[in-house]
Structures are given as C-alpha cells and as structure tokens.
C-alpha cells in the first residue's frame, strides 16, 4: 500500500476537491479529538513536548460499525483463509532488495555503484522528488499496520494471532516492508538526494500517523485499502515507465517489481469487499459512498520535513505534472471499483442504500467534469518550490 497523495485536493495543483469533508454524525457512539499544532504554526521546536504532530487532525468518529456486524467477519474466517491468504507469496519465492542493488561482497561493487550513480545523473530533479515521496510513504509502513489493527472484527488481538485476518495483516506488512527498504537503499546510493532530510521526513511522518476516516470499520477499511493498493500500483508503474524513458532499466525493474506486489495486494483487498457486497450489500454500499464523500485520505497527507508545511501539496503537484499520479488516475480508480464491485447491479437495497448506489454510479462523470474545468483554469500557471530532499533545488509544480 503506501504511496499516494490526494491528487484532487491540492490547491497547488489547482485541481478541485470532489467530495465533501468528513462530518461527525450522531450514529457514531464515540468521538475523539487529537490535539495538534494548527497547520499554520511556524515553529515545532518551540514546544516543550518532545514531539507534536505538525498537522491538525479534526474530530474523529470511532467504532461506528454496529457490534453485531463483527460476527460477519468471524464467519468469514474460513473463506479468508482459502481466498485471501492465497494472494501471499512464500518468503523464499519473494524478491528481496539485494536482488536489485550492487552486491557489497563482489569485487565489482564499487564499479556497480559508479554505474548506478552515472545512470541517476540522467534523471531530472522532479522525478527524484516524486520517487523520494514514494519511498517516504512506503517507509511509514508501521502506520499502515497500526491502521489495519484498529479495525473491529479483523484486528490482530495479540500480536501473533492465528486468525486469517491477523495472518494477512502481518504477512502483507512483511511483503510491503521490502518496498521502502529497496527504494531507500537505491536513493542512498544514487547520490542525488539529501538523505538526512529524507530521514527526518520519515520520522515526522511516522510520528504524525494518518487519518483514513475508516471509523474502526472493516467495511470502510477494506474499501480504503482497495483504493490505495490500486493507486500505488498505478504510481509505481508510472515511475517505472519514466525510469525506462530516462534510460535506467534497473530502476524501471525496481519500480515494476514493487508495482507487481501492489497489484497482487489490490486483488486480495478488492475480493474482500466483493464478498461483503455479496453478503451485506446495504452496509457495504453505504460504507463505499461514505468513503467517497469524505475523499480517500492519502497516507502521506501529513508529510513534513521540518520546513515546508505545504510539502504534501507540493509533492502531489509534481507527481500530477509529470504523470505519476493524477486527478485522472483518481477518478479512473473510482470508476474501476464501481464497475469491479458491480454497484449498478445491486438489488434489494434500502432507500438509503439506493441513494448511495445512485451517488456512486454518477460520481465518476461528475468528477471528470470538475477536473476538466479545473485544468482549464490552471492553464498558464507555472509556480516553483524548493525541496529539501534535493538540497533545496527548485522544481516546477
């Protein structure tokens, strides 16, 4: 999972916000507020606390799923074992970061590093900004495992639970862990980036957490991960395509291998939601519509390097401009999931469920119209911003 940024919410990108912000509702039995610094605060260092997240998190709805729904997920454990765990690869059959990097035990190690650095010199700064952002997002993996373990009915209750849901979460995390490791080592060897600034950004991001608006609900949680895995598949696929265009076949293979993992994970998560539509269509379509109205909050939305409070917007804008992850990709994912889960064909829904169905089926065309208008308004605008990750060199947004 990991990567992604909200390609449709950034002012820097001059792209529209296509959905309503999250609202607290009386249907939720519990609410919580995380107290943080307002996003406009200038000095984190002035605080007496050793760490305070630099971004403000609004009121959060928690445990919105009715308790009796937990039984649905318990009843699906046998199904998950036979249909979801099969999408994991045995460790011995998985690629490892060392497969793509210079071998420090070989006599040609220094020459291999030199060749890697020579290839990296031909790649533009804007690409490295996006690749660094992708890597940082992957490195915040502990946050995503934490998020999955907030979901009622599927969390790992002990840290070593043998339920299929818990086994999946741990093994998924283990597979994903290779992604950040590989990109981190590549970037370190490339000599093109400021690793200390990148490492600070990773620490800030993990410390800040994330706010996916999933309300501890596995319905919402698995819709979120279905979207995210497809988005990361697209994004890593596009960084691989660009690396090939720049003549770095090794980097293209790195990105392509990560994208392949993301595709396999996407298949597993979308199968879970497909099963939920089969056995509980009303609750599932309501959860899907709710997540779309609140927007998919990207894992890196709290990204911060100690300097730039708009770093997420700036990073997202560069990714949009060079075609790694765009507003079009966002709407394509929405349309894909509506089709994949056969939302138009749902029958026997409640009145509220039918409204959610209508909303979801009309959403892609509405977003496309808004995107077209936003792109027209953005014509001719070419702002730039420095990025600490590349030694404060400026890049077009």
From Swiss-Prot:
Family stated for the protein in its record: Belongs to the fatty acid desaturase type 2 family.
Enzyme Commission number(s): 1.14.19.2
Binding sites annotated in the UniProt record for Fe cation 2: 176, 229, 262, 265
Superkingdom in the source lineage: Eukaryota
SUPFAM superfamilies associated with the record: Ferritin-like
UniProt entry keywords in alphabetical sequence: Chloroplast, Fatty acid biosynthesis, Fatty acid metabolism, Iron, Lipid biosynthesis, Lipid metabolism, Metal-binding, Oxidoreductase, Plastid, Transit peptide
Gene Ontology biological-process annotations: defense response; fatty acid biosynthetic process; fatty acid metabolic process
Pfam families the record matches: FA_desaturase_2
Functional description taken from the UniProt entry: Converts stearoyl-ACP to oleoyl-ACP by introduction of a cis double bond between carbons 9 and 10 of the acyl chain.
Presequence extent in this chain: 1-33
Top enzyme class: oxidoreductase
Example of a GO cellular component annotation carried by this entry: chloroplast
Name of this chain's protein: Stearoyl-[acyl-carrier-protein] 9-desaturase, chloroplastic
Cofactor note: Binds 2 Fe(2+) ions per subunit.
GO function term, MF aspect, one: metal ion binding
Oligomer and partners: Homodimer.
Catalytic activity: octadecanoyl-[ACP] + 2 reduced [2Fe-2S]-[ferredoxin] + O2 + 2 H(+) = (9Z)-octadecenoyl-[ACP] + 2 oxidized [2Fe-2S]-[ferredoxin] + 2 H2O
PANTHER family noted in UniProt: ACYL- ACYL-CARRIER-PROTEIN DESATURASE-RELATED, STEAROYL-[ACYL-CARRIER-PROTEIN] 9-DESATURASE 7, CHLOROPLASTIC
Binding site for Fe cation 1: 138, 176, 179, 262
Compartments it resides in: Plastid, Chloroplast; Plastid
Pathways per UniProt: Lipid metabolism; fatty acid metabolism
Cofactor(s) it depends on: Fe(2+)
